[in-house]
Design a protein with these regions (language model features):
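N-terminal secretory signal peptides
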Residues: 1-12
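FAD-dinucleotide binding site
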Residues: 4-6, 18-447
Length: 447
């Protein structure tokens, strides 16, 4: 499973509208071509906007290029013995995340994950207490250094200038590549600081992608509809796919900045200087997973523990191993930045074997365990995303807010790239969809 491509284009038909089955979509032979609001993208931002607008009594149609819903929230329920989130996994700031009450109301199993143990190992030998203390101290010093950056901004890597000890290098790479998905040399300190802490962080046993899927119930969603152009026509917006044109009073665009930057969608009039500047400051980062299913559990670890390389840690090829989430015989390796992109571009089996070798070296062997199944995500190679999520470049300033308001009176941008404190997250994308819906509702009330 090296990559995931969805580029079909079929009519707005009963087949495309009912492709979600369990989501109880309207059994229409053809979707409406004139609505109050058309939503481009059936990820969490688009679904949130559509749900809210429909709840307020507005007619809504969601156009999705893929043959599935959820966007970068995608739970694989078939490849392994347990569900695996191939995209976003954690409910960040779970105590105030808007998806938390939705998940609870539907009976999803949630697990607080902030207290998971961390193991730093080389050939099965655990890091000494002194080494662990150095790692913890480096993380704390980095946080303090980030707090001290002034309004001029700085690249995260600049906080490790000159002679930088291995613990500080680790902290930098954890915060940049393994968190933001961008190179430390290009990642904005002020952008990371504005996002704040993600804690508390919770996992969803059935998959966060399943929670997002549940948002689609009752919505009119046309799958396989790649939008080619969006034209603002005074009192309306025309959204064209290969199959048809939908006319709406308002349009919400939730595609990634990677898609916008690729000009896969033609805008008339074109995007203005503010939007283009924001897109330049918000490239797609890379965060990919290599999923390894073993034929039994690794001994000496509790479900949900983390494993990292100790002295053998490679700053330019950082990996984090999530061990046996919810007691499944799974190891989910995570890589970001250029190394995440490298794994995404490699053949899936090659990526699996490379990561398995790193895990084996870290543990000093697998205790007789064998690889039963594997997969590797490749969000950068998917033309519907071009990456995992948007990180803020150094000096990018208020690019997220600028993109959020760049559309104008009838065109609205939403998605994780436009979020504030929960930027780069599923919860932030959801909130951005609600923001766009509120703006549309206010506009429709005036017409």
């Amino acid at each position: 499973m090296a990559s995931f491509y969805f580029s079909f284009s079929i009519p707005l038909s009963r087949r495309s509208l009912l492709a979600l089955g369990a989501c109880a979509l309207p059994a229409r032979v053809r979707a409406r071509t004139q609505v109050d609001a058309v939503i481009v993208g059936a990820g969490v931002a688009g679904l949130a906007a559509a749900r809210q607008l429909q709840a307020w009594g507005h007619s809504v149609l969601v156009l999705e290029a893929a043959q599935r819903i959820g966007g970068r929230a995608w739970t694989d329920r078939h490849s392994f013995a347990a569900p695996v989130d191939l995209g976003c996994s954690w409910m960040h700031q779970a105590d105030r995340n808007p998806l938390t009450p939705i998940a609870r109301a539907q009976g999803f199993t949630l697990l607080a994950h902030d207290g998971a143990a961390e193991h730093f190992l080389d050939a099965g030998i655990a890091a000494s207490a002194q080494q662990r203390a150095a790692i913890a101290a480096a993380r704390q010093r980095l946080a303090q250094a980030m707090d001290g950056v002034g309004p001029q901004d700085a690249a995260l890597a600049s906080l490790c200038a000159g002679a930088c000890d291995p613990a500080r290098q680790r902290a930098i790479r954890e915060r940049a590549e393994l968190d933001a998905g961008g190179a430390a040399e290009d990642t904005s300190v002020l952008g990371l600081r504005a996002q704040g802490s993600t804690a508390p962080n919770w996992l969803v046993q059935q998959g966060l992608g399943r929670v997002v899927e549940s948002l689609a119930r009752g919505l009119e969603i046309a799958l396989g509809q790649r939008v080619e152009s969006i034209e603002q026509r005074g009192a309306s917006v025309a959204v064209r796919t290969a199959a048809s044109t939908v006319t709406a009073v308002h349009c919400v665009v939730t595609v990634s900045t990677g898609v916008l930057r690729s000009e896969a969608i033609r805008f008339t009039p074109g995007l203005g200087p503010a939007a283009l500047a924001a897109l330049d400051a918000l490239p797609m980062g890379h965060f990919n997973k290599v999923v390894l299913e073993l034929d039994g559990p690794l001994q000496g670890f509790a479900p949900g523990d983390w494993i990292y390389e100790g002295r053998s840690f490679q700053p330019q090829q950082a990996l984090a191993f999530l061990i046996h989430p919810f007691a499944a015989n799974l190891v989910i390796a995570m890589a970001g930045g250029s190394f995440g992109l490298q794994l995404a571009c490699a053949p899936a089996r090659e990526a699996q074997q490379q990561v398995l070798a790193r895990l084996r070296n870290c543990l000093g062997g697998l205790g007789g365990r064998r690889l039963r199944a594997g997969a590797a995500t490749a969000w950068a190679r998917n033309p519907l995303f071009h990456g995992s999520y948007a990180y803020l470049r150094t000096g990018g300033g208020a690019a997220r807010a600028a993109l959020a308001r760049a559309g104008g009176e009838r065109l609205h941008f939403a998605g994780e790239a436009t979020a504030g404190v929960l930027a780069q997250t599923c919860g932030g994308a959801y909130l951005s969809g609600l923001r766009a819906a509120a703006a549309i509702h206010a506009g429709l009330a005036l017409t």
